[in-house]
Regions:
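PLP-dependent class I/II
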Residues: 2-12, 20-22, 27, 33-40, ...
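Conserved N-terminal alpha-helix of the aminotransferase class I/II PLP-enzyme fold
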Residues: 72-105
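Substrate/cofactor-recognition hotspot
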Residues: 16
């Protein structure tokens, strides 16, 4: 793979040709370019809570800086944060978590990457959801693994079809990636589906990466983790963090929970890459988990209100059908009635209506026929976006 640089060419490692990207940031760049030219754009493309971080968390970080928490820390994370995570995660999932099973990382993505680096050899198969978070496939391909998608379908409320997943297992299957609540659909895996999958995997040497970053943003029912079922905790890596729950995306604070011997290997990868996670942000993480939780409740209830507004609004627009998502802060409307491809419609809404959203195909080929909107924006802006989309649809459809 070569890239022109002046009169010379940069010769990159072949693996770089296998590295993907995340379309949300590409759309954000295009939207910013339109704004720079004077066009008003409503941003419903980025999955980032628009709330400020709670004051007690900010103050904990500020005090940590004043107290000198500005130096290297342990690669696996500060003991006090690992203890707080173990207590919180164990209580919320009704499982026992030891601090030795926790690795703290700068954001949740290193847990995805390090899990795949540590477990997947060339040619090993990894099952992942499609549509799904695009970085899953990117990381699988980067390490020369075989990316094997399983479908999430609207007629199943975007729950996992366990029979389909089991039908894709082979002797080469090393890892299954689950994501619930799910990005981009907002779907939530049912207890029955998780239980059936756990039972089927009981006698197989297969790990599960369970991406539970939205686990506290569920609007009906409760979060269920596959680690709650017999025999699964020791073969599951939980990915979680602070970005979505506590509106701390820019703090870069995530963690993984896994068996201690694997945690030691992931900590080695931290040593060889990031060294450690910033200490003062970890002190803030302790305050987030052990302090007042009303900020989380307020964020969830505001998202619930916005969800109602955007679902009702989209269902009034010709050509759109929007099911009610049960978690996260995304809607994934079916746009087959518009007779437009997902990419073409997303481009038109950005360029002509001034509404930034993502094509369903940004999350895999099986996202065709859908768009993803993030309702991590004010009700006022969501309503304005809906008015623009409806006006565009009535002019063009």
């Amino acid at each position: 793979m070569t890239i022109p640089v002046g009169e010379k060419k940069l010769r990159l490692a072949e693996r770089m040709s296998r590295l993907g990207t995340e379309s949300a940031f590409e759309v954000l760049v295009r939207a910013r370019e339109l704004e720079a030219r004077g066009k008003e754009v409503i941003h419903l493309e980025i999955g980032e809570p628009d709330f400020p971080t709670a004051p007690h968390i900010i103050e904990a970080a500020a005090q940590a800086l004043r107290d000198g928490w500005t130096h290297y820390g342990p690669p696996a994370g500060l003991p006090q944060l690992r203890e707080a995570i173990a207590e919180d995660a164990g209580r919320r999932r009704a499982i026992r978590v030891d601090p030795a099973e926790v690795v703290v990382t700068p954001g949740g993505r290193p847990i995805m990457f390090f899990t795949i680096l540590a477990l997947v050899n060339q040619g090993d198969e990894v099952l992942y959801p499609n549509p799904g978070f695009p970085i899953y496939e990117s990381m699988i391909r980067f390490v020369n693994g075989q990316a094997v998608p399983y479908a999430l379908r609207e007629d199943r409320d975007f729950d996992v079809d366990v029979e389909e997943v089991l039908g894709k297992l082979t002797d080469c299957t090393r890892l299954i990636i689950l994501n619930s609540p799910h990005n981009p659909t907002g779907g939530v895996m049912s207890r029955a589906s998780i239980a059936a999958l756990a039972e089927a995997l009981a006698d197989r040497d297969i790990f599960v990466l369970s991406d539970e970053i939205y686990s506290r943003l569920i609007y009906e029912g409760e979060h269920v983790s596959i680690t709650q079922f017999p025999g699964m905790k020791e073969r599951t890596i939980i990915l979680d963090g602070f970005s979505k729950t506590f509106a701390m995306t820019g703090w870069r604070l995530g963690y993984g929970i896994m068996r201690p011997d694997l945690a030691g290997q992931v900590a080695r990868l931290m040593t060889n890459s990031n060294s450690c996670t910033a200490s003062f942000t970890q002190i803030a993480g302790v305050a987030a988990l052990r302090g007042d939780q009303s900020c989380v409740d307020q964020i969830r209830e505001e998202f619930r209100r916005r969800r109602s507004v955007i679902v009702e609004g989209l269902n009034r627009i010709p050509g759109f059908h929007c099911p009610l998502p049960h978690g996260a802060f995304y809607v994934f409307p079916n746009i087959a009635g518009t007779k437009r491809s997902s990419r073409a419609l997303a481009d038109s809404l950005l360029n002509e209506a001034g509404v930034a959203c993502l094509s369903g195909t940004a999350f895999g080929a099986w996202g065709e026929g859908f768009l993803r909107f993030s309702y991590a924006n004010s009700v006022e802006n969501i309503q304005k976006a809906l008015e623009r989309i409806e006006a565009w649809a009535r002019r063009n459809l």
